Regions:
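Aromatic- and charge-enriched surface segment that lines or borders ligand/interaction sites
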Residues: 122-238, 292, 406-409, 477-488
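Structural transition elements
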Residues: 344-345, 493, 508-554, 574-584
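Extracytoplasmic/peripheral linker and loop segments enriched in polar/acidic and small residues
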Residues: 55-60, 64, 443-447, 454, ...
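Gly/Pro-rich hinge or "lid" segments in bacterial periplasmic/extracellular proteins
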Residues: 107-110, 240-290, 294-405, 544-545, ...
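Extracellular/periplasmic solute-recognition and catalytic clefts
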Residues: 347-358, 383-384, 396-470, 496, ...
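Short, well-ordered beta-strand elements
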Residues: 67-77, 157-161, 215, 291-292, ...
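N-terminal lobe/hinge region of extracytoplasmic solute-binding protein
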Residues: 72-151, 339
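Long beta-strand-rich cores associated with HINT superfamily self-processing modules
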Residues: 706-743
Length: 790
């Protein structure tokens, strides 16, 4: 008889208990294994059942992360552009402003916003010149008080930047020098790159000091057609000679491309454009630590541009490194692996999975600010006064496609803040607490910090000016018809309803591009094309009947094209996934349905959407704009003709082109905030309201969400380098996560009992069968013995 059969026929209780216990553990482990960091949790009920087990067997983050000075968070969309010349989307800024350092920055705590030197010794020195190139004796600090005649004398403004000595680039293989002092990684072949997937795979790295040439190189590089920088179109009208320089680079690129075609070189391996070889009047390196930028006329807002990533330094070695044949094929570029002098460096970039920023070992440690408001003091935002930044060792951000998964992991404590690049969760949590719904109980009990501010930005819908149906029109008659169509749609879009439903009334409907918080916003109370005054100092949206009347005048009575007899169809380009996005799309369809206009929805991911907008192939679109700097010029340029996205790669997404508007903009943009400037802004408002190239949408609140162990969270869509100032208390984090995610042990003991109860009848049946078999066998043996004796 085998040992197993002997056990089943006479089981040892203690051994049976061990087997049942092992089976129970296997069952628990299998159940807990269903919850993986990749899968996330798809419902709150699932979380209630499985979270205790997950905490015991399979936490979504490694334990060692929790005890370190790591910030743990998530992101929704993989950033498409991390190159300082091309990056301009909100979801890219947490990384670009952590790695790159423009010359200026904003004081992290002060409001109103205050510009400060970042890599400079002091703020830029301004010198004014007349048309003859002679310097003017005008004090820049008293410029606002100068007469119009004196200001009109200014033909050029020179910004002089003095760079701090001793600032170092991060370690990178582009800077490696061999024993002979030669750069050793700039003559690589595709064969040399066979096992390379990131710059961290190189065994040799180096670094060097920042100098003025790096800033000059970065500015000149904005003109290359290989990158298509969204800043070049506008800056080419401001930096002296930049437009002609762009034309020169365009021709040089065409020459190199033709040469490559003749030699059979593929497009990804075009010869490197070395911008050290090309100079122009607007950018001058005086010495290794001094740079001069020459601006046409008077443009006070240029100082804000110097705080943007477009003006971050680019080392020529890095540009040459990524231009080598084979790099693009392996997705090695400044778009995926940026290089800078900032507080962090990108050390992990797994597409659609995870991105990690690690402390730059060469960073000089700029001190945390010691000045702030009484409120900042009360909130503990000055506790880290004077400490060298960054205060974190790493920022680990995981790609999350499902909002439910983000919310669950955040409430459990495994994410310190829900999302790296967006402020919507903070506002949503505030609404939840206000209404007593959702996670309100946990948010209050776990002391989640929910600071909020008014966002300097807007969400808007726009028409493509290049489109034959909703755009400019080729004849005056067509232009008038198209305008009436746009006006009718503008009236039909009930943003008051939208704000009430989707924003929980925590947003403000806009009447122009000049949003709340900007100079000139109070100069015009409402949009007279869309609203009527109600006689009590308020206003109300015009009726749908008025919109239908305009639609008929546009040639589409009842939504039918009078000429063709076919239904009017509008193509709507948008981006977004999930039930929330679908609900909003349904709302848009409902607005068009009021006019009996059919809507063709072309929903796509954000990267493809950006490509469509760059090509000018959209007809009607939805997008947002967050201010780069707190000045109306930064919004009014969204309709400036030379800033067209399709024509010049700028940020005029509607490709709006109106000569009068452009003239007013060119005059307004150079002015200080005076009554004269406000009057020009009002005229521009009238034009955009009458022509209706946009539906101005709404401006929403912007809020952060941080656990109690996160310090220094102060949300702002103007200040983009927040990551350098955030801090965590790992000990408190570990303690709270342990408290909140204690495993419920009764299933641990109950499951083996249940398994034992299920197994025991089977064991009894087996034993009975064995007893019968044994008895039968003994009987047979007895009979055989009896037969032998006979």
């Amino acid at each position: 008889m085998s040992a197993w059969r002997r056990f089943l026929s006479h089981p040892k209780p203690w051994l049976l208990a061990c087997l049942v216990l092992l089976a129970g553990l296997a069952g628990l482990a299998g159940l807990a294994g269903l919850v993986s960091p990749q899968m996330g949790l798809h419902a709150q009920s699932s979380a209630m059942i499985l979270d205790p087990l997950k905490g015991l067997f399979n936490a979504p983050v490694p334990k060692e992360w929790l005890s370190q000075a790591y910030l743990l968070t998530s992101y929704q969309e993989d950033p498409k552009y991390l190159d300082s010349a091309s990056s301009y989307s909100n979801n890219e800024t947490p990384w670009t402003y952590a790695v790159y350092e423009p010359p200026l920055k904003y004081h992290y705590l002060k409001r109103p916003y205050e510009l400060l030197p970042r890599t400079l010794v002091d703020m830029p020195l301004l010198t004014f010149f007349d048309k003859g190139g002679r310097p003017l004796k005008i004090d820049p600090s008293a410029l606002k008080d100068q007469s119009e005649e004196v200001r009109a004398q200014i033909a050029q403004t020179v910004f002089e930047l003095k760079i701090k000595p001793g600032i170092m680039f991060q370690p990178h293989p582009a800077f490696y020098k061999n024993a002979q002092g030669e750069l050793g990684n700039l003559k690589l072949t595709p064969n040399d790159l066979q096992d390379i997937r990131s710059p961290l795979d190189f065994k040799t790295t180096g670094f060097r000091e920042l100098n003025a040439y790096d800033y000059a190189y970065a500015i000149k590089r904005l003109a290359t057609p290989r990158i298509n920088s969204p800043a070049f179109g506008f800056l080419s009208t401001k930096i002296v000679g930049f437009d002609r320089f762009g034309e020169k680079i365009q021709k040089e690129n065409q020459r190199l491309k033709a040469l490559a075609d003749q030699q059979g070189i593929p497009g990804q391996a075009l010869p490197w454009l070395d911008f050290r070889a090309y100079d122009f009047e607007g950018v001058k390196v005086v010495d290794p630590y001094t740079l001069q930028i020459k601006i046409s006329g008077l443009y006070p807002q240029f100082k804000y541009w110097l705080a943007m990533s477009f003006f971050a330094p680019v080392a020529w070695e890095v540009d040459a490194f990524y231009a080598q044949n084979g790099m693009a094929k392996r997705n090695l570029s400044a778009n995926t692996w940026p290089v800078g002098t900032g507080p962090f460096m990108l050390t992990e970039h797994d597409t659609n999975s995870r991105m990690v920023l690690s402390k730059n070992p060469n960073y000089r440690g700029e001190p945390y600010p010691c000045e702030g408001s009484e409120e900042d003091l009360a909130l503990g935002l000055l506790k880290d006064c004077g400490k060298p930044t960054p205060l974190l060792e790493k920022i680990i951000s995981t790609r999350e496609k499902e909002g439910t998964s983000v919310a669950t992991k955040f409430i459990q404590g495994y994410y310190d803040m829900p999302q790296m690049e967006r402020g919507e969760p903070g506002i949503a949590y505030q609404v939840s607490i206000q209404d007593g719904t959702g996670l309100s109980k946990e948010l209050l009990e776990r002391k989640i910090q929910l600071p909020a501010t008014i966002q300097v930005g807007l969400w808007h819908y726009g028409f493509n000016w290049l489109d034959p149906v909703v755009g400019a029109g080729k004849t005056p008659e067509q232009a008038e018809r198209n305008k009436k169509l746009r006006q009718a749609i503008s009236i039909a879009f009930d943003f008051e309803e939208y704000v009430s439903i989707f924003e929980n009334s925590r947003a403000q409907v806009n009447h122009s591009l000049v949003v709340p918080g900007l100079f000139g916003n109070d100069a015009m109370l409402f949009n007279p094309v869309v609203f009527d005054p109600d006689g009590a100092g308020r206003f109300k949206r015009k009726s749908i009947d008025e919109a239908k009347r305009l639609l008929a005048q546009a040639g589409y009575p009842g939504g039918i094209d009078r000429e063709s007899g076919k239904a009017l169809v509008i193509n709507y380009d948008t981006q977004g996934v999930g039930p929330g996005a679908k609900t909003r799309i349904d709302w848009v369809s409902k607005q068009f349905a009021k006019l009996n206009i059919q809507l063709e929805v072309r929903n796509t991911d954000y990267n493809r959407f950006q490509d469509k907008m760059r090509k000018g192939s959209a007809q009607f679109y939805f997008w947002g704009w967050l201010a780069d700097y707190p000045d109306p010029e930064n919004f009014l340029f969204l309709l400036y003709g030379p800033n067209s996205k399709a024509k010049f790669g700028g940020e005029n997404s509607s490709n709006f082109d109106n000569k009068r508007y452009d003239q007013l903009f060119e005059k307004m943009k150079d002015m200080e905030n005076t009554p004269e400037r406000a009057a020009l802004i009002v005229q521009m408002m009238h034009i955009m309201q009458e022509e209706a190239p946009m539906l101005f949408g709404w401006s929403e609140e912007y809020g952060g969400a941080y656990h109690q162990w996160v310090r220094n969270g102060k949300p702002s869509n103007i200040i983009r380098d927040q990551m350098a100032y955030l801090n965590v208390e790992p000990t408190l984090r570990v303690q709270k996560i342990s408290e909140w995610n204690r495993p419920v042990l009764w299933p641990f003991f109950l499951l083996p009992v249940l398994i034992a109860l299920l197994l025991w009848p089977a064991v009894l049946v087996w034993r009975r069968r064995q007893d019968v078999s044994i008895a039968q066998g003994m009987n047979d043996v007895g009979q055989q013995k009896s037969g032998v004796s006979t």
